[in-house]
Amino acid sequence: MFGVLNSDDHRAAIQQRNILAFGRTSSELWTSNPTSNYWCETRGNGRDSGQNRVRRPMNAFMVWSRDQRRKVALENPQMQNSEISKQLGYQWKMLTEAEKWPFFEEAQRLQAVHREKYPDYKYRPRRKALPQKSDKLLPAASSSLLCRQVLVDKWYPFTYRDSCSRATHSHMEDQLSSSKPVNIANSLLQREHHYSSTSLRGSPETLATHLSADPPFYPK
C-alpha cells in the first residue's frame, strides 16, 4: 500500500515539474520574440486599428455640446446617452443665431487647423452592415399565385364537408391560375353564392325521395 502511494506521489511530482518547465520555456520564448508581443498588443485591443483613423473636425454643435453633455450627465447620472443627445439637440434648436455664432467661429478655426494638419484628408463615412438576404426567392409566377390563394382563403374559407365542395374548390383554383386578378372577387362571389344556394336548396321531390328512402324507426 505504501509503495502505491509513493509511486503516485512520485508521478504527481514529475507532472508538476514538467508543467513548471513548460511554463518557464514558453515565457522565455514570449519575451525573446518582439513580434509576438506586438501582435498581442495590436490584436488584443480592438481600438488600436481605429487610433490611426483621422477623426472628423468638430462642427458648431459638437463644440457646443462638448461641455453641455458633461453638464447634463453630471446632473442626471441615470440618463442614457441617447436621451442626452435628444435633449442636447432640442436645446441647440432653441438657441438663437447670436448665441450659436461663437461656436460657429470656433468650429471654423478647428477646421482650418485640421486642414493644415491633414491636407489630404477626405471624409469617408463608415458603411452600416446590411442584413443578409436569403438566396432562395420565389419566382414571379408562383409568388403571384400564392398571393391569390391567400386572398381567396381569406375571403372564402372552405370546409370540406362533401365531394361537391372539394370539386368546387379545385375548380376555382384552376380558374385562379389562368384568370386575371381584376375580376377575381366578382367571379368568386357569384360562383360561391350559386353553389351554396344549389347545394342547400333542393326541390320537394328530392327531399321526399330522401325521406322515403330512410327506414321507419319503431321504438321497442
Swiss-Prot record:
GO molecular function, one term: DNA-binding transcription activator activity, RNA polymerase II-specific
InterPro entries cross-referenced by the UniProt entry: HMG_box_dom, HMG_box_dom_sf, SRY, SRY-related_HMG-box_TF-like
GO CC terms, sorted: cytoplasm; nuclear speck; nucleus
Chain positions covered by the region annotation Disordered: 195-220
PROSITE patterns: HMG_BOX_2
UniProt-listed GO biological process terms: cell differentiation; male sex determination; sex differentiation
Keywords for this protein: Activator, Calmodulin-binding, Cytoplasm, Differentiation, DNA-binding, Nucleus, Sexual differentiation, Transcription, Transcription regulation
One family name in Pfam for this protein: HMG_box
Keyword check for Transcription: yes
Residue ranges of DNA binding: 54-122
Superkingdom of the organism of origin: Eukaryota
Subcellular location: Nucleus speckle; Cytoplasm; Nucleus
SMART domains: HMG (SM00398)
Protein family (similarity comment): Belongs to the SRY family.
Subunit: Interacts with CALM, EP300, HDAC3, KPNB1, ZNF208 isoform KRAB-O, PARP1, SLC9A3R2 and WT1. The interaction with EP300 modulates its DNA-binding activity. The interaction with KPNB1 is sensitive to dissociation by Ran in the GTP-bound form. Interaction with PARP1 impaired its DNA-binding activity.
Function: Transcriptional regulator that controls a genetic switch in male development. It is necessary and sufficient for initiating male sex determination by directing the development of supporting cell precursors (pre-Sertoli cells) as Sertoli rather than granulosa cells. Involved in different aspects of gene regulation including promoter activation or repression. Binds to the DNA consensus sequence 5'-[AT]AACAA[AT]-3'. SRY HMG box recognizes DNA by partial intercalation in the minor groove and promotes DNA bending. Also involved in pre-mRNA splicing.
Name recorded for this polypeptide: Sex-determining region Y protein
Higher taxonomy: Eukaryota, Metazoa, Chordata, Craniata, Vertebrata
